[in-house]
A protein has these predicted regions:
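General marker for long, soluble alpha-helical cores
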Residues: 1-213
């Protein structure tokens, strides 16, 4: 343990008042960084808790530009979303420079990973669950413009999303003024009607095939 840091050996460093301002977990993160030859000056501040320190340390280990997120205004989870985005060479500016919480950032990052048009839902007006339902629609090539509206809550969005997946006439219930329970009943009624039509068409085709045999 003779390594030197800022002209101090580790043995001397750990005895300083500066080092002892940190709690046990923060000290661990600082020591991990020093042992890995990292520039711990990016995170060796008491304003960062140990989980935030960890995210900055992991970014430094991967040679990432931690200046994107080494800021106490971000929670550790927000920092993680930025770090993971940088690892994947994503355009993290889409979600770093806005007032998104960590879970919103996660949904935007996941959309960027899948090369989706995240600008459709990368808006503060959507919470993370609404974002997830819109992202799911984009992944399934649905016309999300029908429900990418903050006037719909996430359950209403999901009802419309499921209707689109089942080729239902969602125009009947895609209205934010319709309560979600009523939406569900309309959706189920349309599903039953579709299933009945499908069964009828199946048996009709079987009969036609039989007589044409």
């Amino acid at each position: 343990m003779s390594k030197i840091y800022n002209n101090l050996s580790i043995e001397t460093l750990i005895k300083t008042a500066w080092f002892n301002q940190f709690d046990k977990n923060q000290k661990y993160e600082i020591m991990k960084g020093i042992e890995a030859d990292l520039d711990v000056s990016h995170y060796s501040y008491s304003k960062f808790d140990w989980r935030e320190m960890e995210q900055i340390r992991l970014g430094l280990e991967d040679n990432l530009d931690v200046s994107w997120y080494a800021d106490p205004k971000y929670s550790w989870f927000q920092m993680e979303q930025v770090r993971l985005g940088l690892e994947d060479n994503l355009n993290v500016s889409i979600y770093v420079e806005e007032n998104f919480n960590g879970h919103q950032m996660e949904q935007i990052r996941l959309g960027l990973v899948d090369d989706l048009d995240v600008l459709i839902y990368a808006k503060e007006e959507f919470d993370c669950v609404q974002m997830e339902v819109i992202r799911d629609g984009l992944e399934n090539n649905l016309d999300v413009s029908v429900y990418a509206n903050s006037e719909f809550d996430w359950e209403q969005m999901l009802c419309i999303n499921e209707g689109l997946k089942n080729n239902l006439d969602i125009s009947i219930y895609a209205n934010p003024e319709i309560p979600v329970e009523k939406m569900k009943k309309i959706k189920e009624k349309l599903l039953r009607k579709n299933n009945s039509s499908s069964k009828f068409d199946f048996y009709k085709n079987q009969i036609i095939a039989f007589f044409n045999y």
